Amino acid sequence: GQEALSKAGVDSNPAVRYIDLEGRTVVPGFNDNHVHALILGDHRSVPSLAGLDAEKIVYAVTKHYPAPKPGELLLAYEWDYPACPNPHRKILDDAFPDNPVVLVQFSGHGVWVNTKTLEAMGIDQSAPADSASSAGNHTAPEDPLVRDEEGNATGIIRDSSSNSLLMEHFKKVHRNPALARERLETALREFRERGITSFQDNTWFFPAILGYRRLKRHGRLTARVSCWLFGNDPKRSALMNLPLYGGNLLTRGPWKFILDGSFSAHTGWLCEPYANDPGNYGRGVPASHIEGYLEFLLKKNRQGAFHAIGDRAVKEFLDAAEKVAGKNPRLKDFRLRIEHAQLIRKEDIKRIRDLNILVAAQPSALATPDKDRE
């Protein structure tokens, strides 16, 4: 207490400021090891649909967009299957016949859209010629659309990156410096309120780096940011690899690679098929690609973070890492990360340890397992 401060000479330093917390607790700032800051800011600009059923979702979207212009995109986030188990485009068609609607599922790896959106994407919602292979309220692995028993699109798209309207929205936000800065400041404010003083950010887009630089220049960057590059798109990441960083507030983080999808979208890569989706093992990346990613990291001398949710995705990553490390043991010193790792085979736990790999799991996956369907 006071004796320790006195011995250290702190109490005699005129620059020291004393604050009486009146018995409250002080803890070090938290580090969040996996965020999407700009997208979080975007979430807060539109309705949250978390925990809402279909009727309440329609009400929330209508309230936020009371008089939309014809053709204006209606966007919202975080609906989930426990509260809304049977989403369908017709529900949105009835409520919003003149506007494309994009509702992002809580995992971020799936979207619920209406017919206007499908039309804007150039997708025919009727049954394709080979609909038999993708019917039954499920989808063939190569088809991002979930279809009903007749093969018609239900309005669920399994991979959000397959939604061109959503991707165009993100590009619009990134291209507008003021809008991007506002989204980042919203996220930073939320981090401050929760005691987060540093975070690992899936930055991905070059303009977001410029947004952070502006905030830093004006003294408004209130947390240390590690900016992750998007390894699946080398051209995009080449820009982010420029010397844009510096100091301890804004640093260049690992390269991020995506190896599968999510359980709730039935795109997480599994060793066995989904219990209620026969024949669907999810989606993954060829082993040769994973090995190429690892060789690339060795060449760049950079850490890598690999999105792998399903047990097959984790297994394939470990297979590739063992193969590459066998040729170049230096790979074990890179502290490679497996992001999420929601399902791991028991025999792979030792392999993770032997390869000196970090598992970056998120508590939310444990706290809300009911949101990840069978």
What annotation goes with each model-predicted range?
Residues T115, I209-R213, V314-K323, K350, ...:
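Histidine/acidic-residue-rich catalytic or RNA/ligand-binding cores of hydrolases
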Residues R220-W255, R335-Q342, K346, D372-E374:
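Phosphate/diphosphate-binding loops
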Residues S288-G292, K315, D319, L336, ...:
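Feature representing long, continuous alpha-helical segments
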Residues E322, G326, R345:
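N-terminal active-site wall of soluble small-molecule enzyme domains
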